Structure formats: C-alpha cells, structure tokens
C-alpha cells in the first residue's frame, strides 16, 4: 500500500534550507517566477473565492503581486514553519500569510485547496465549529478585500519528511480580529460592485488601507482634509467607489 504523498503540519519548527539545484523537475515546475505557475495560483484562488458558501457580494478578484511574491520567497527560503514578522511582509499595505508543508512536491492547486478545505470547520458569521479547529488559512484566502497575492516555495532537504515549504502572502491583510468570523459580505455575487464585476468577482479594488477602525465616522465629523485622515484613512478618503 502506497504511503499518502502529502503530510501537513501547523507546528513551530526551524528547518535548515537549501534551494533546489534544478535537477528535480517536479520542484522546478512549482517555482513561482514562471508565468504558468502564477496563473495557476491566481486562477485557483479566484475559483475558490467565487464558490464560497454563503455567496459573497463584495469578493474582489485576485491579482498577482510581484512584491508580495518576493517577500514570500524570502521567507520560504528560511524553511521555518512559523509566520514571518508582519514588518517583513509589508508592501504598500500590511499583508497576511498562509503556510503549507508537504512531504512530496504537491501542486499549488492542492496546497491552496487544503487551506480552503478548512471551511468545513467554519460557520459563516459564527466562527470555528470547535475550539481546536484551524480556520485562519481559509478566512484569509477568502477575505474579501485581499486582492493581491504572491507566493514562494523552497526545498528543505534536511527535514526528515516535510521537505517542501509553500508560502503565500495576501495584501491587504485579512483576518481582522474584530470581523474574523465574517470574511466577506453575504449576498448576491457582485451586488456590492455594480458595473465592476467579472465572473462573479468584483474588480474595483482599492490600493490603500485604513489604519484606524473608525475612519468613516471621522470622515463625517472632521473631513478628509484633516491631517489624521490624510495619514490614517487613505482608503476611506480615496476609494469612495471601491471595495476596501
């Protein structure tokens, strides 16, 4: 009986890392500087994002971020199964992160699907179905405003079994602590973005983020000309007709 090809752990460990020398075709085919790999990653994310249950009215279509991919690859090269420091995965905004380890070179689609499958342990609007359920990879993957993704992979030969390390970073970051159980707005697909819809996903993304949780009320009271809003509420003030 053949051994299962993939084993995934979400534990803390430090693994020495050596990059592939190019002799392993299965690994080489996963390197994310290749356009076909980037397309696979983007297409898989968008396929899953538009298939959420319940459906989402404000789910943004994802795009590839070269900057996020560079950061993800740098972290993957360290072969450590812990999340990177938030400051190390910033682009123009804060970025979230999903990690995956495999005993064999799984496809990117399989890695991404494994994150999405955490939805089986998640109830929309409520949260994890049990105290020990891990759902943060799923909620980040389907976080409505995370529209940029970049990924990297490393080969870690000194690890006994989990030799393949996958990292994806998402910008702007999802999993807001105050709204983590509602990763998107429930409703008819694209209802929140009339005129900006492609295959059930919104395309009116915002390149900025708010650094305060009460930007909308501050806008109503102080106006976007106030220095505080200029610095801390760029999305609210510059993306009126966009999703953020």
Swiss-Prot record:
Residues 206-239 form the ShKT domain. Belongs to the CRISP family. The gene is CRISP2. InterPro entries: Allrgn_V5/Tpx1_CS, CAP_dom, CAP_sf, Crisp-like_dom, CRISP-related, Cysteine_rich_secretory, SCP_CRISP, ShKT_dom. It comes from the Eukaryota. May regulate some ion channels' activity and thereby regulate calcium fluxes during sperm capacitation. Disulfide bonds join 190-197, 193-202, 206-239, 215-233, 224-237. Residues 1-21 form the signal peptide. One of its GO terms (cellular component) is extracellular region. Testis. PROSITE patterns: CRISP_1 (PS01009), CRISP_2 (PS01010), SHKT (PS51670). This is Cysteine-rich secretory protein 2.
């Amino acid at each position: 009986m053949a051994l299962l090809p993939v084993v995934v752990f979400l534990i803390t460990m430090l693994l020495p890392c050596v990059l592939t020398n190019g002799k392993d075709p299965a690994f080489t085919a996963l390197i994310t500087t290749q356009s076909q790999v980037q397309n696979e990653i983007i297409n898989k994310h968008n396929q899953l994002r538009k298939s959420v249950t319940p459906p989402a009215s404000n789910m943004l279509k994802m795009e590839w971020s070269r900057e996020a991919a560079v950061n993800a690859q740098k972290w993957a090269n360290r072969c450590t199964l812990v999340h990177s420091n938030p400051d190390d995965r910033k682009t123009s905004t804060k970025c979230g992160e999903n990690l995956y380890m495999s005993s064999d070179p799984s496809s990117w689609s399989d890695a991404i699907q494994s994150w999405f499958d955490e939805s089986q342990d998640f109830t929309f609007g409520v949260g994890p179905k049990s105290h020990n359920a891990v759902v943060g990879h799923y909620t980040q993957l389907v976080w409505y405003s995370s529209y940029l993704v970049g990924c990297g992979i490393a080969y870690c030969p000194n690890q006994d079994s989990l030799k393949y390390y996958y990292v994806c970073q998402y910008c702007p970051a999802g999993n807001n602590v105050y709204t983590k159980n509602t990763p998107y707005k429930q409703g008819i697909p694209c209802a929140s973005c009339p005129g900006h819809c492609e295959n059930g996903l919104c395309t009116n993304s915002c390149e900025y983020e708010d650094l305060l949780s009460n930007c909308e009320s501050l806008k109503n009271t102080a106006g976007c000309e106030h220095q505080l809003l200029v610095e801390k509420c760029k999305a609210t003030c510059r993306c009126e007709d966009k999703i953020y």
